[in-house]
Amino acid sequence: MAKTLGLHIIADLYGVNPDLIDREEDIRHLLENSVKAGELTKISSHFYQFNPHGATGVILLAESHISIHTWPEHKTATVDVFTCGDPSKAYRAMDYIINSLSPTHVDKKVFDRGIIEDSKGKDVLWIMSKAGCC
């Protein structure tokens, strides 16, 4: 049986209120609160305001990352949540973002990342846990 090193959730959010995704400050607040909702560990972050519309941002996590890119003129945001360790943390972070933005339609995909063999997986996961990742 194989194990995985992480869970990657990607989502395209359509029909989002443009006022919620136009400003860098709002995107920053949204992602930082999603980190808290997922009980994840923030290492650093970077955000950027586009002109005339939209913003992008990423939070580097001890567990991996959360990112968003927005197109308010199309009422659309794309979101990535990738974590190692407890998969429920990734789901909680993504659910927070989706619930906060209240899109009319969500196209969400979930991927297992870093599939490893059981015999090797125990060693790799143990090393990663000692490094504080998972």
UniProtKB/Swiss-Prot annotation:
The molecule here is called S-adenosylmethionine decarboxylase proenzyme
User: Which reaction is the catalytic activity of this chain?
Assistant: S-adenosyl-L-methionine + H(+) = S-adenosyl 3-(methylsulfanyl)propylamine + CO2
Q: Which SUPFAM superfamilies match?
A: S-adenosylmethionine decarboxylase
What the protein does comes down to:
Catalyzes the decarboxylation of S-adenosylmethionine to S-adenosylmethioninamine (dcAdoMet), the propylamine donor required for the synthesis of the polyamines spermine and spermidine from the diamine putrescine.
Q: In this chain, where does the modification Pyruvic acid (Ser) occur?
A: S64
Select a single GO molecular function from the record's annotations and give it: adenosylmethionine decarboxylase activity
GO CC terms in record: cytosol
Instruction: State the species of origin.
Output: Hydrogenobaculum sp. (strain Y04AAS1)
Q: What is its EC number?
A: 4.1.1.50
Tell me any Pfam family this protein matches. AdoMet_dc
The domain of life for this entry's organism is: Bacteria
Quote the InterPro entries the UniProt record gives: AdoMetDC_fam_prok, S-AdoMet_deCO2ase_core, S-AdoMet_deCOase_pro-enz
User: Could you describe the post-translational modifications of this protein?
Assistant: Is synthesized initially as an inactive proenzyme. Formation of the active enzyme involves a self-maturation process in which the active site pyruvoyl group is generated from an internal serine residue via an autocatalytic post-translational modification. Two non-identical subunits are generated from the proenzyme in this reaction, and the pyruvate is formed at the N-terminus of the alpha chain, which is derived from the carboxyl end of the proenzyme.
Q: How does it assemble?
A: Heterotetramer of two alpha and two beta chains arranged as a dimer of alpha/beta heterodimers.
Annotated pathway? Amine and polyamine biosynthesis; S-adenosylmethioninamine biosynthesis; S-adenosylmethioninamine from S-adenosyl-L-methionine: step 1/1
- Listed Gene3D superfamilies: S-adenosylmethionine decarboxylase
* GO BP term, example: spermidine biosynthetic process
Q: Cofactor stoichiometry and binding? A: Binds 1 pyruvoyl group covalently per subunit.
Which NCBIfam families does the record associate with it? SAM_DCase_Bsu
UniProt lists the family membership as follows: Belongs to the prokaryotic AdoMetDC family. Type 1 subfamily.
| SS bonds (residue pairs) | none
Catalytic residues per the record? S64, H69, C84
| Keyword annotations of the record | Autocatalytic cleavage, Decarboxylase, Lyase, Polyamine biosynthesis, Pyruvate, S-adenosyl-L-methionine, Schiff base, Spermidine biosynthesis, Zymogen
